[in-house]
Amino acid sequence: MTTITKAACIGGGVIGGAWAARFALAGIDVNIFDPHPEAERIIGEVMANAERAYGMLTMAPLPPRGKFTFCRSIQEAVEGVDWIQESVPERLPLKRGVINEIDAAARPDALIGSSTSGLLPSDLQAEMKHPERMFVAHPYNPVYLLPLVELVGGRKTSPETIRRAEEAVAEIGMKGVVIAKEIEAFVGDRLLEALWREALWLIQDDICDTETLDDVMRYSFGMRWAQMGLFETYRIAGGEAGMRHFLAQFGPCLKWPWTKFTDVVDLDDALVEKIGAQSDAQAAGRSIRELERIRDENLVGIMHALKAGDGGKGWGAGKLLADFEKRLWEKGGSPSKSLDASGPLRLVDTKVNAAWVDYNGHMTEHRYLQLFGDTSDALLKVIGVDFAYVEAGHSYYTVETHIRHLGEAKLGQALYTTLQLLSSDEKRIHFFTRIHDAASGDVIATAEQMMLHVDAKAGKSVPAPAEVMAKLKPIAEGHAKLDAPDGAGRHVGQKR
């Protein structure tokens, strides 16, 4: 299995910066080279958007965030890395020169991907000394959320390189689609180009404005495409007779003059101004960053809906998200260091991110419950109740929870949790969790909870196996010597 342990991003604009965010959120350190004087600020803003999106996207345990290192040269950036992603402006001489420089300085086995939207990989690798490890890795914006990457080899690209690239992107939650033959603009951008040309004609000829055109897409076939694509959508349109009936019914339409996309619209100053003015009105004063955040929230919602599709197995991008989360849970594993049961167990360290706060900048109620849940999950991993254990059919279910809010958690605040076992037996675990401010140690919230060991298939409680009880025993013995926590046993409305 090919994995990326360290990456380099050459070019840190919209695409390059988002690649860097995707790598970093997968726990990969990233070297960045971009001569733009504000590259660090730009990439920092992209990273902030990405962290906010991931905070909404998944509750699976993400690895520690990879570190950004801004380098002074391409040579410095590519030294010792596994994957190099080139994302410089779309000009063949510039890209070819940058790729040649990467080729000369990179490790012989390092993978070199280009984010080009349409240039042929054979043209990009023409002057390389090691062209066999170079390929197109064409993503879609925002790279940190949209999982697709088109993998396109050139004439000199080895099949082994494409295989390694496909494995590597899967490990960071992406869907590597291998394009069988190289062609300008590959697959996705050729489809987008056709749609874009027709859209420009519709605006040019005053058939509609930009908002009307976007409404037609987002309230209709755009929703279908997000979950079934083009051909599967049309298969359904053919009814019980399927695709062949659809083609027989609508095939003759191809000879009708319904489109103008084979003609190139004259994108003159007047049309540019027309589209620009309509787009400004459509944005209604929202900044690009605001629109990006709205886009990201909507994409997260779509992926969550797709994750629940096909009877809970996941569908399309949602199934990919479910598979990625499964790997994250498996990698979360048990803590690498032994835990000291002479005091409450410190199990989770985190920071309040933008996805966790309300309009007041305070952490929302359900995020407190999420953090308590993350802590109980961490305890279960300590005693051997990991993903494989759950997949085998047994688990612990939470049956009772009492939360107290004693303070406020705010955006950017560092937090940690501690857990104290109150009692346990072969079926039950009764425990008390505190959320602390990392700087002062003050307790912000507490939760007293009870979990039952269950046979998930039978739908009933059953005794935990001996190996789980053996791991729970030293914690129970250590915590039996501790004073009862303040607040344990309280109920709602209880007088002090």
Swiss-Prot record:
Known catalytic reactions: carnitine + NAD(+) = 3-dehydrocarnitine + NADH + H(+); N,N,N-trimethylglycyl-CoA + H2O = glycine betaine + CoA + H(+)
CDD domains: 4HBT
Signal peptide: none
EC number: 1.1.1.108, 3.1.2.33
The entry's keywords: Cytoplasm, Hydrolase, Multifunctional enzyme, NAD, Oxidoreductase
Binding site for NAD(+): 11-16
Pathway assigned to this chain's UniProt record: Amine and polyamine metabolism; carnitine metabolism
Self-association state and partner proteins as the record states: Homodimer.
Function: Multifunctional enzyme that catalyzes the NAD(+)-dependent oxidation of L-carnitine to 3-dehydrocarnitine and the cleavage of betainyl-CoA (N,N,N-trimethylglycyl-CoA) into glycine betaine and coenzyme A. Can also hydrolyze L-carnitinyl-CoA, but with much lower efficiency. Is involved in a L-carnitine degradation pathway that allows R.meliloti to grow on L-carnitine as the sole source of carbon and nitrogen.
Protein name: L-carnitine dehydrogenase/betainyl-CoA thioesterase
